[in-house]
């Protein structure tokens, strides 16, 4: 493993080409959700599994934890990355990450399904296109 110093160009990747991204990271915030659904660990596990399938992803493992007095965290480990959900039923709020890698992934379908399943009356969605080093333009290939 090579260690790079701050400001050093990653010369091994300086081919000047830029390929299209293959990874998307969706950051979804759900507001005014059904508080009972946000506190139902079994329900949340079920919808994460279904969301992964809608995104064309393969679930490798699904773990969850119910907190006292309320709230759940659940994470679906995917062959293509992950989907996670953290809930605050007392605030009718949930934070969701959907990170997928690959050409045939449809994380937007998973996002829409989760919005509907949790009955969110409002939501915020940010999409980040993740780029492996070979897809990053030469001018931004410096280590910060």
Model-assigned labels for residue ranges:
Residues 1-144:
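Polybasic/polar functional segments that serve as interface/processing modules
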